[in-house]
Amino acid sequence: MKSFKNKNTLRRKKAFPVFTKILLVSFLVWVLKCSNNCNNGNGSGDSFDFRNKRTLAQKQHEHHHHHHHQHQHQHQAPHQAHHHHHHGEVNHQAPQVHQQVHGQDQAHHHHHHHHHQLQPQQLQGTVANPPSNEPVVKTQVFREARPGGGFKAYEEKYESKHYKLKENVVDGKKDCDEKYEAANYAFSEECPYTVNDYSQENGPNIFALRKRFPLGMNDEDEEGKEALAIKDKLPGGLDEYQNQLYGICNETCTTCGPAAIDYVPADAPNGYAYGGSAHDGSHGNLRGHGNKGSEGYGYEAPYNPGFNGAPGSNGMQNYVPPHGAGYSAPYGVPHGAAHGSRYSSFSSVNKYGKHGDEKHHSSKKHEGNDGEGEKKKKSKKHKDHDGEKKKSKKHKDNEDAESVKSKKHKSHDCEKKKSKKHKDNEDAESVKSKKSVKEKGEKHNGKKPCSKKTNEENKNKEKTNNLKSDGSKAHEKKENETKNTAGENKKVDSTSADNKSTNAATPGAKDKTQGGKTDKTGASTNAATNKGQCAAEGATKGATKEASTSKEATKEASTSKGATKEASTTEGATKGASTTAGSTTGATTGANAVQSKDGTADKNAANNGEQVMSRGQAQLQEAGKKKKKRGCCG
């Protein structure tokens, strides 16, 4: 007490206002009365509540200011003998109260000072503080403590689920389950690699894990060392890895399904590399774990297609839920924090659970992409982050018409492409071809960009969805057009655009070019929509930004092409391009963005369907090569 008193005395020399004292005393008296009468029906109601409040305040103060409590209680003792009983020491100090109050006044002042500040509030409604003798647990602390505990609990849950689900496993899925259970995968889901899109809580988010720990399955690495490196890195058994890699999973897991093996656009309708409807589950998700996966999971390793095996439509995509599903954000890695919040630890986003996911959603878009917003800005600069770049451009154009200057490369490229597209549909075609070649080359050469694109695209998709939706589209459009007019960095843009397009898995980029080029307005719209995703990307972005707008612009573009949507689809330009581009880069951005933005799974589906051809073809060509290397699952 004295040490505290001294401390307080030293700390607080202000005389405690008499008014405050009076208020406190009166309040305490009232409380005391209440305590006496509380049992009686009379004062039980409000009096009781205030009493609790007071007690609460005191208790809280006790926890936080133990010495203060004692002072306080001493001060209050005369009036609150009962109260003091809680605080034994103070009980007998009632007589001393005045002395101590004065002697301790400074201390009291400290305490009472707080107390009175609190008290009026308390009188008004300290209720905010739950009555408790224990210190109030801070939510942050709880959360901080939670990740480790959560993980452990999660494992427990996981184990229980493991057995439960084992019992509940559908017959068709039992094989996989048993197989992996034997391996201690304990994935209650159909297959260890298949997690319910909608409930990511069922098991470790393998996609998230894989994205976090790519196992060397990144596009860049895939071409050369893919199988071996991945196998070496694979946490699980080699057999399983091989199954996924080589498509054995197709045999073992229905989820892995031929889609996993077939890199054919038909299976790719999901838009392997980038697109894929959220539920397409096509390999498109392999690359991005479905766009959802990339979006949701870590943008980092959007392509762990192998693991997902993009099993059919379930595998990857089911595994990687769209935004909400996975770590979803957290995982920058799984998009849905829902996915594996536990694993969110792997993905920065989900560290704390699904909200990481939210963050990830934010993060996904932003965090996953190094802060999408910034990244976009950066992306514009780093157009090399294809998706990011393109999208950035789109977004950025949306977000930063000014950034567009950064984007100028891209925007101009887009504009350029647009100009080309507008001016020269065939030029755009050439650009497309070039892009195709370039993109293919880049895609293969710079698979990572593609994958990055997938990731970023996914992220960007969301962003694009969000941003593109923005009125900035118009601004972007203007910016792009202006830039187009300015023609700044057009060369750079072409390269950037090509790279971006390439990164975008340029089927879409090509398409984008066409789509964009066909209709300058459409392209501009797309481009503007795309925000300087170069018209091609613009188409894609248009698709993303405005699945409908892109489609329309794209449609127009395709019409301009003299092709209908099918033509676009065939070309993978215009709508298909948007979709394809969206599927590819835009597609991922566009298609997914369309999904996310427009929430038009249908558009995506439609786009995917249409895109599948162009996107699937282009992407399959570009991404398919990688994927084929990956094998059905990866």
From Swiss-Prot:
Residues 540-580 are annotated as: 4 X 10 AA tandem repeats of [TS]-[KE]-[GE]-A-T-K-[EG]-A-S-T. KAHRP might mimick human histidine-rich glycoproteins to anchor host thrombospondin or a parasite analog in a binding complex with the endothelial cell receptor. GO terms for biological process: poly(A)+ mRNA export from nucleus. It is found in: Secreted. Residues 494-505, 605-620 have a biased composition (Polar residues). Glycans are attached at residue 42. Residues 57-87, 108-117, 406-422, 625-634 have a biased composition (Basic residues). It comes from the Eukaryota. One of its GO terms (cellular component) is nucleus. Residues 1-34 form the signal peptide. Residues 95-104, 567-591 have a biased composition (Low complexity). Sequence repeats lie at residues 540-549, 550-559, 560-569, 570-579. PANTHER family: PROTEIN IWS1 HOMOLOG. The keyword Protease does not apply. This is Knob-associated histidine-rich protein. InterPro entries: EMP3/KAHRP_N, RNAPII_TF_IWS1. Residues 354-375, 396-405, 423-444, 453-493, 509-520 have a biased composition (Basic and acidic residues). The keyword Thylakoid does not apply. Residues 57-143, 347-634 are annotated as: Disordered. Keywords: Glycoprotein, Malaria, Repeat, Secreted, Signal.
